Amino acid sequence: MRESELIVRRIREGTVIDHIDGGRGLQVLSALGIDGGDGSLITVALNVPSGKFSKKDIIKVENRFLKDDDTNRLALIAPSATVNIIRDYKLAEKRRVALPNEIGRIFRCTNPDCITNSSERIESVMDVASREGPVLKCRYCSRILDVSRMDYT
């Protein structure tokens, strides 16, 4: 085996998130609510040398299959990521992330007076105001949000 090869166990069934920008893998896990609490085997490789990028992160989650809306939510955190669905050790489906028109349940609004931060139990929804940047706007209070400073829910 060559020194440059990465040794990571193959998964039989589940999801592989590849080409995550280096150092962002833990943010991806947090945004998707993947914490291992359900007993699934999770493999995380951070800052792996990559030919396409200088470094990338890889996440493998056994027995969990991301839905399309989960895949598209990754566009803010990991715009160049690919999501591979694995069945019986084989690639069954490959998806590229794409920024949706709205993003719900990932971020909390940064406005402390927003109804989503009250005792009302209302989930936050961010509308994509601009794909450049990108720029998000809270659906409830219209605050423009800086993606890099937002808290995950």
Swiss-Prot record:
The entry's keywords: Metal-binding, Pyrimidine biosynthesis, Zinc
Binding site for Zn(2+): C109, C114, C138, C141
Gene that specifies this protein: pyrI
Domain of life: Archaea
Annotated family: Belongs to the PyrI family.
Molecular function, one GO term: metal ion binding
Subunit record text: Contains catalytic and regulatory chains.
Record protein name field: Aspartate carbamoyltransferase regulatory chain
Purpose: Involved in allosteric regulation of aspartate carbamoyltransferase.
HAMAP family membership: Asp_carb_tr_reg
Details of cofactor binding: Binds 1 zinc ion per subunit.
Cofactor entry: Zn(2+)
